[in-house]
Structures are given as C-alpha cells and as structure tokens.
Regions:
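Catalytic pocket-lining loop regions of alpha/beta-barrel enzymes
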Residues: 1-107
C-alpha cells in the first residue's frame, strides 16, 4: 500500500496573505509532513502488529526526514510505554519503504 505527499489534506497548512508563488512554494515543501503523520499513525496504531505481512511505501516524499522521525518515535515509545510488539525502527525495516525524490545529500 502506498501513500503520496498529498495524503492528509491541505486545509490550514500555509499562512494567509501570501501571493500564489509563495503559497505554492510553501505548500509544496510542507507536503512532506503529511507522510510523516501517516507513518507515525501507522507505527503507533497497532496496525503493523495486526498485519505483519502488509507493506507500505512513502512515495515522492524523500528520505532525509526518516531517521529523525524514527528517533522521535523511539523516544516517544519509551516515554509513553506504548504497548507495541516491535520498536519503530523494526517496523520500518520489516514493512515500510520510501522513495527518493529531490534530495542528493542522502544518496
């Protein structure tokens, strides 16, 4: 199953008062955050425990943000004693894929 950078809705994402060019640049950059939300919800929902052979891919959202997100998930898992069968990094390794897009630093 895949999710794209446009998943998650667009309402209230950019500040008002911007001209169209600034708004499009801002929105196009922020859209990556929607995939972050999807991954966090996927990891903490318990869905990956219930369906251990179902795979997911984050499409056209790059990969540079993934290490930070997984580190934050690991931290919150420990802070909140979330009852998961695996660690967030283990779920990612087992069931989640991501695609490069425009970044070069992570290649």
């Amino acid at each position: 199953m895949n999710f794209h950078i446009g998943s998650g809705g667009l309402g209230g994402i950019v500040w008002g008062g911007m001209d169209l060019t600034r708004m499009l640049a801002s929105l196009s950059t922020i859209l990556f955050m929607n995939n972050m939300r999807c991954l966090v919800n996927l990891i903490f929902s318990g869905l990956l425990d219930r369906f251990p052979t179902l795979n997911f891919v984050s499409v056209e959202s790059g990969i540079g943000w993934i290490p930070f997100l997984l580190e934050a998930c690991e931290y919150q898992l420990d802070e909140n004693a979330v009852p998961l069968e695996l660690r967030p990094r283990e779920y990612f390794a087992r069931q989640i894929y991501a695609s490069f897009w425009l970044e070069r630093a992570d290649v």
